[in-house]
Each structure stands twice: as C-alpha cells, then as structure tokens.
C-alpha cells in the first residue's frame, strides 16, 4: 500500500510540473524543456543511492525518496507538454493526424520497452542471483543508475536542439 502511495508521487509531480509550465511561452519553454530532464536526472540519481539503503520505513526515512520520486514527475510535467506541441508543429498539414496518433504509439512502445529493460537490468543486477535482501538492494542500485542515463540523454538532446535553433 505504501509503495502505491510513493509511486503516486511521480504522478503528482507530473501534474504540478504541467500546471507550472502550462502558461509558459518563448524562452521559458526552452528552459522548461531543459530543466525537465535535469529534474529527472536528479531524481533518478537520488533514487540510485537512497532506495538500496536499508530503511525503517519511518516517515523521515521516506521523505528523501518521496522528494526524488516527485522530482522525476515534475521533470516530465515541465517538459512533456511542450515536446508534444513541437511534434505537432513540426508535422506538415497533411501529417498532423498521423503525428498526433503516433504520439500515443510511441508512449506505449516506450512504456513496454522500459518495463522490459527494467526487468532485464533488475535480473542482471542481482534480483535473482544472489537474490534476497542483498540482491534486491544491488538490483535497485543498478536499476535506477542505468535509468538515469535516459534523462541525461534528454539533457544532451535538449541542449543540442536549443543550440541548433539559435544558430538557425
């Protein structure tokens, strides 16, 4: 039950990020697209080091984990709506419907691929061998560490796109 509440913090962070960034325009959108993956990276790195540690489950032990989860959601909420708009704007008038429909397809594919990759990383990270508490701790470390690469990649792409846009 507690794990479900913790996972909901990402959704709450996403909502807060979307509300914060909903009224942005111009350069502020560029910043939101860059700050989003930075938040995601910080949250993932936080989870990389916080989750594998033994916790008593007390509120104060969970607060940093809660903040890291909310930070990941905040990052998605800041950047994602503006990225969707960019996809639709980049499509020609004849391809607008196709672009809109493909967004959902890409989201579903990314979710399925991410779940499969998470399972592979967790298993390779020790979830099964050595297993037990030690294996779970080790798997959590590798899982969040490997998945921290995704927002790092997002930062690089956002910076390159911003630099390209400025040079055009």
Model features per residue range: what roles?
Residues 1-128, 133-165:
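12-transmembrane solute porter fold
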């Amino acid at each position: 039950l507690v794990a479900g509440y913790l996972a909901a913090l990402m959704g709450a962070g996403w909502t807060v990020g979307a509300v914060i960034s909903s009224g942005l325009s111009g350069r502020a959108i560029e910043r939101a697209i860059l700050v989003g993956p930075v938040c995601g990276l910080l949250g993932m790195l936080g989870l990389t080091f916080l989750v594998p540690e033994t916790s008593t489950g007390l509120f104060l032990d969970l607060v940093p984990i809660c903040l890291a989860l909310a930070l990941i959601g905040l990052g998605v909420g800041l950047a994602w709506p503006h990225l969707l708009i960019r996809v639709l704007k980049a499509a020609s008038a004849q391809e607008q419907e196709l672009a809109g429909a493909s967004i959902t397809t890409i989201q579903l594919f990314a979710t399925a691929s991410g779940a499969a990759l998470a399972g592979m990383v967790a298993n390779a990270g020790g979830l099964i061998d050595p297993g037990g508490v030690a294996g779970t701790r080790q798997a959590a470390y590798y899982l969040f560490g490997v998945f921290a690469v995704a927002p790092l990649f997002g930062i690089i792409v956002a910076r390159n796109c911003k630099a390209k846009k400025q040079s055009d």
